[in-house]
Amino acid sequence: MSRLFEGVGVALTTPFTNNEIDYEALEKHVDYLLNNNIQSIVVNGTTAENPTLSDEEKDEVLKAVVKQVDGRVPVIAGTGTNATKKSLEASLRAKEIGADAIMLITPYYNKTSQRGLVAHFTTIADAVGLPVVLYNVPSRTNMTIDVDTMVELAKNPFIVAIKDATNDFDYHNKLKERLDLSDFSLYSGNDDNVVRYFAEGGNGVISVVANAIPGDFQALYEKSKRGEAIDKDFEPISRLLNALSVDVNPIPIKALTAVEGFGNYEVRLPLVTLESSDRKQLEEAYAKYKAGEL
């Protein structure tokens, strides 16, 4: 069996206009990503402001993206919650809508044990029967998938990838050593570490900044896959990422997607948009980046 997923996936933002989902902007954004050859789209994840979307909104966004993509790249639906029953229900709806895979975050707030993680993920994976990408992001959940647990979970035929947002290369290298990477994918969940991640055997990235610069990130991956050095190519992207670090994701990236015409610059509470001075500085940095001057 070969790996199902690799390359640049985009953690899609949800465009709003007057606090409602802007489906016209969503369609434009998806076309922009596809025209720049990204290799998968993740819908309803952290960057999509998942907690502020109703179940109906999540389903409608997924329907719109699945229709727009029309089989050209895999669509991965973020369906994980901190309740197994709710996650399973969302995953089954995603399957019915036409998602190619689901992404499951580790349960948060009501943290479980490593045994509980195995039970949670395998219950959903076995019942849904779609490829599963696990999402390990301890900075947001205060919970991690231990290496031994990941090895056990990878025995499940439906669990085919991990989005690793630990930024821990000891963890990454242990996974690389112990998993069969002929049919399992290691995705970085951190834009800022991709040079090293690709060099040390990572199969791709699920990117935030690629919402705005998909072509540049895809070119970076393709160059790395050819065995070419990408350090210099990454330097201006790194400076753009520094500018984006002004606030928590997805507040800054949505300022850039607004510049590109994908909805207004809006986020839903409890998130708030950047202060006007910070937004101005970020947009100036982005303009310099696009002009090749950053």
Curated annotation (Swiss-Prot):
GO biological process: diaminopimelate biosynthetic process; lysine biosynthetic process via diaminopimelate
Catalyses which reaction(s): L-aspartate 4-semialdehyde + pyruvate = (2S,4S)-4-hydroxy-2,3,4,5-tetrahydrodipicolinate + H2O + H(+)
Chief localisation class: cytoplasm
PROSITE patterns reported in the protein's UniProt record: DHDPS_2
Gene Ontology molecular function terms on file: 4-hydroxy-tetrahydrodipicolinate synthase activity
Top-level taxon of origin: Bacteria
Site feature Part of a proton relay during catalysis, where: 46, 109
InterPro entries, per the entry: Aldolase_TIM, DapA, DapA-like, Schiff_base-form_aldolases_AS
Residues the record marks as active site: 135, 163
Subunit structure comment from the entry: Homodimer.
PANTHER family in UniProt: 4-HYDROXY-2-OXOGLUTARATE ALDOLASE, MITOCHONDRIAL, DIHYDRODIPICOLINATE SYNTHASE
Protein name: 4-hydroxy-tetrahydrodipicolinate synthase
Source organism (scientific name): Staphylococcus carnosus (strain TM300)
